């Protein structure tokens, strides 16, 4: 068995804690519940040229929920290079488990939509074509098209999730279409919207679940995140989850290394698991029902 490389923070973990090197859940178990399609749109710069954006989706009415009811749509923005792994992108974006019965029942049913960036690697191996501001309108238009043609206009609320680069895109989407979305769940980004934009969030009763680890390898908490926390705390509807350590389901502190350590950046993994350890213990005591509990509360409040 290959010996795992110790992460650079290994000597800082609490006494009695241990490190594990992969999530405890299986990937792909629910991929068959998702469909894949393609959205065609025109670019601003090349009005005569059509572009395509692939996407995955899940329809709750195919899995026991009544067809004549309205449901929210949960949009999941994947991270950098995740479009290059095929169907695994469903999992990496944090969407797969939202097709599970327990998640769907917790929120009363929800459509799931995963837009896919047209990423590729250049001759030097660098990822190009990932999410940026040029994708904001196409993603918005995809959501509108999906709501009309896939959900028959029966969409109640719109919630956008994002992981890493997708979390930055998550903020940018709501910044641009603040009166369109009802909630956002950015995971693993320091690109928090400015104060004036957060004021617009409050004016539109936007709910925000902000999640970033204090030891995120790509987003320095002390210099980039901590200065923005007081402003987030003043928002009308903001839950802040900034754990000291990111854990796997077995209570092990998470380490992931694909040439660079990123275990503490990959908060998407426990968020995908509803912030629950495998033994049913909540990772965040103030969220006894996990992320789906927060989503359920948000949806009920928005319906009131």
Locate the predicted segments by residue.
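Short, proline-enriched alpha-helix->beta-strand connector loops that line the catalytic pocket
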Residues: 108, 201-208
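Gly/Ser-rich "nucleophile elbow"/oxyanion-hole loop immediately N-terminal to the catalytic nucleophile
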Residues: 64-65, 69, 124-164
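Active-site machinery of serine-nucleophile hydrolases
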Residues: 73, 77-137
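Short, solvent-exposed loop/turn and secondary-structure capping segments
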Residues: 67-69, 84-90, 124-128, 172-173, ...
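Alpha/beta-hydrolase fold active-site loops
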Residues: 72, 110, 157, 207
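C-terminal catalytic histidine-bearing segment of alpha/beta-hydrolase fold enzymes
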Residues: 209-218, 223, 233-304
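A domain-start/cap signature at the N-terminus of enzymes
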Residues: 1-72, 163, 168, 227-228, ...
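Primarily recognizes the serine-hydrolase "nucleophile elbow" in alpha/beta-hydrolase
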Residues: 155-202
């Amino acid at each position: 068995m290959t010996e795992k490389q110790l992460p650079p923070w290994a000597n800082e973990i609490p006494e009695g804690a241990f490190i594990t090197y992969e999530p405890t859940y299986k990937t792909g178990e629910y991929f068959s519940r998702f469909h894949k399609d393609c959205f065609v749109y025109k670019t601003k710069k090349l009005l005569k040229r059509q572009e395509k954006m692939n996407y995955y989706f899940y329809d709750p009415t195919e899995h026991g929920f009544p067809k004549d009811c309205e449901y929210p749509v949960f949009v999941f923005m994947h991270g950098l290079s995740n479009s290059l792994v095929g169907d695994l992108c469903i999992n990496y974006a944090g969407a797969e488990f939202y097709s599970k019965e327990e998640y769907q029942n917790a929120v009363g049913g929800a459509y799931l939509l995963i837009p896919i960036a047209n990423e590729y690697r250049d001759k030097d191996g660098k990822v190009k074509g990932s999410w940026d501001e040029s994708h904001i309108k196409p993603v918005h238009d995809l959501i509108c098209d999906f709501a009309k043609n896939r959900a028959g206009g029966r969409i109640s609320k719109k919630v956008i999730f994002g992981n890493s680069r997708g979390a930055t895109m998550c903020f940018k989407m709501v910044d641009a279409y603040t009166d369109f979305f009802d909630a956002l769940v950015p995971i693993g980004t320091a690109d928090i919207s400015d104060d004036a934009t957060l004021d617009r969030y409050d004016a539109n009763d936007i709910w925000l679940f902000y999640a970033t680890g204090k030891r995120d390898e790509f987003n320095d908490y002390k210099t980039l995140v901590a200065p923005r926390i007081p402003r987030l705390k003043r928002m009308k509807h903001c839950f802040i989850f900034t754990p000291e350590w990111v854990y796997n389901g077995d209570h092990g502190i998470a380490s992931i290394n694909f040439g660079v350590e990123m275990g503490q950046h990959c908060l998407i993994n426990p968020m995908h698991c509803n912030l629950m350890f495998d033994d049913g213990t909540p990772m965040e005591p103030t969220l006894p029902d996990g992320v789906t509990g927060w989503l359920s509360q948000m949806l009920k409040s928005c319906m009131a």
